[in-house]
């Protein structure tokens, strides 16, 4: 059977809805629209940054998570964890020794957090996980402010 286009439609409909709610609120009440946009930026960015921090990511990886999350949350193909993970991998470059010890380090918690390869993966996964949580909270707040003004 051919692939359904429903997941693609849903993947783009939710971000379009969020942006539309903010734009409509801006036109009816600029102050509330600003509050919505600020809420979206702070919830998505902060939660993604918290995820990167929980993974003990480099401060620039945490900053990358905060800066990219509000935009990547609106794009179904991009993820803020990719950008924070890329920053982590660029700043704290894994060595050949990290790759060689990978098969041993994945079996202990200490090794999992110490190995630079798995640390990059932790930064990616936790940034995305917490960023998704921030997207739900921020989206709910955008909807709340929208209905409060109408």
Name what the model sees in each region.
Residues 1-150:
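Compositional signal for N-terminal targeting/processing segments
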